[in-house]
Amino acid sequence: MVAGAYVPTSGQILLDGKDVTGLPSHELFRRGLLRTFQIAHEFSHMTVTENLMMVPDRQSGENLSSAWFQPARVAREETAVRRKAEEVLDFLKITHVKNELAGNLSGGQKKLLELGRTMMVDAKVVLLDEIAAGVNRTLLNDLVFNIERLNSELGYTFFVIEHDMDMIARLCDPVIVMAAGSVMTQGHIEDIQKNEAVIEAYFGGSPTGNATSPAAEQPASEAQP
């Protein structure tokens, strides 16, 4: 619903205090709300740089009339977009793959590319769907590091759906636990891991006293760093 795929039957979705409930995904995109996917969707036969340059909306070069009658304007815009892409590549420290076909990237590199796409339009809120899935530990650390930087240095807000509790513990406060489509509880990760209602809902048991109980390993966790 937050991403615009479904229209809620009640309640509101607010972005910067403005009601965006029911807006389609492309309108949310223009307002700065973007998402990544558990399975990356790259343009596999385009380079990493070209994938980034595809992101900004309403580029003059997309219009046949502008491309034909305003070539100088199109060239200026393309230069600016390419410069922005280079800045993103440098920020994420993946300039070494800028000319690589995106389809040749590893799973973790594709997730970095998806994160880079959100930077091409200076997103306000980014929805991260299972960003740790299929990513080796080294690249996952890179992902988490860059998410932290985007939050602390550029003011991005992240809404995370994730089952990797180490990642959630590092990134997210608060953590929201949902069951059967409703919010069960929210709070700091350490409190969530000891919450009897969470343990009962997901394991049908009670806490054993272990502060790192696996009880919170299954809930979908949504959070803002």
Over which residues does each language-model region extend?
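A short, surface-exposed alpha-helical micro-motif characterized by mixed small hydrophobic
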Residues: 168-170
